[in-house]
C-alpha cells in the first residue's frame, strides 16, 4: 500500500458529499483505478539479497476478484529497474493468469474445462503453478459422489 496509499477518508464516510481525492469521491473507485482491485491485499513477502547487486521479493496475497495489476504497473513505473512477475488465480470465477512488467497480461478463463481438457485451454506452466488439473479432478470426483448419493436417495 506504500506505492499507492489509500486516501484518507473524510467525515461521514458513507453519507453526504465526500471530498474528492485524486478525482474520486469514494474508496471503491479510487482502489479500482489505483490497485486494479477493491481491497488492499494482505501481503506475505520474503526478501532475498541475491548478492549480485539484485534482490528477489517473493510472496503471496489475497485480493478481491481481480489481480492488482494497476498497483504493480505503478510500482514498475516508480522503479523502472524492477522486473515484476505475478501469477494469479480466482477459482470462484475460473480465471488464471500471469502478468509481468515487460510483456503484459497472459489471462485465461477455464469455466468449461475439465481435468482432462484444462491443458488444452491453459498453458502448462499455469496449470502446474496452481495444480489446476489436480483440483479439477478432486472437484469432479466430489460431484460424481454427490450424484451417486442423490441417485441412492431418489
Regions found by a protein language model. Give the residues of each.
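Intrinsic low-complexity, intrinsically disordered or marginally ordered coil/linker segments
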Residues: 1-154
Amino acid at each position: 500500500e506504500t506505492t499507492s496509499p489509500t486516501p484518507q477518508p473524510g467525515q461521514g464516510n458513507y453519507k453526504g458529499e465526500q471530498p474528492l481525492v485524486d478525482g474520486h469521491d469514494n474508496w471503491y473507485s479510487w482502489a479500482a483505478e489505483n490497485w486494479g482491485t477493491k481491497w488492499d491485499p494482505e501481503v506475505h513477502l520474503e526478501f532475498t539479497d541475491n548478492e549480485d547487486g539484485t534482490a528477489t521479493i517473493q510472496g503471496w496475497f489475497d485480493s478481491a476478484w481481480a489481480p492488482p495489476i494497476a498497483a504493480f504497473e505503478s510500482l514498475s513505473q516508480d522503479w523502472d529497474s524492477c522486473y515484476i512477475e505475478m501469477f494469479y488465480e480466482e477459482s470462484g470465477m475460473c480465471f488464471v493468469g500471469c502478468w509481468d512488467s515487460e510483456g503484459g497480461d497472459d489471462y485465461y478463463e477455464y469455466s468449461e474445462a475439465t481435468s482432462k481438457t484444462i491443458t488444452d485451454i491453459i498453458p502448462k506452466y499455469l496449470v502446474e503453478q496452481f495444480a489446476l488439473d489436480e483440483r479439477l479432478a478432486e472437484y469432479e470426483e466430489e460431484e460424481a459422489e454427490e450424484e451417486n448419493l442423490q441417485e441412492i436417495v431418489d
